[in-house]
């Protein structure tokens, strides 16, 4: 299935690459994880539970949280520092919720730097797709 077909199925728009001018070298461009990679990840590691709570650091437009909820019915939090991407994730959430089978889909987005996100006790699965430098990664891990 093509990227746009997956997006259409989920009623979201996450395709594309976005370079940022005047951005710190610690934060990388926007590029969503390919759906084919997500399929491999979830096929390879089948120990996921619907009670898990996934946190996607550098979630961009939210592809990973929507994929997690749609396929596992697990909670997902997207953490995004870029205001424009955060807004697009929120627009995707509104579109997803319009036609979601459950109006209580547990997907949320936080507009905050990854190193500022407070890990909650429910958070037990963490996802990173090249969102930032090793220095920022270390700060997140220290949390």
Enumerate the predicted regions with their spans.
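A short SAM/SAH-binding and catalytic strip from SAM-dependent methyltransferases
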Residues: 124-135
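Glycine-rich SAM-binding Motif I of class I
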Residues: 62-66
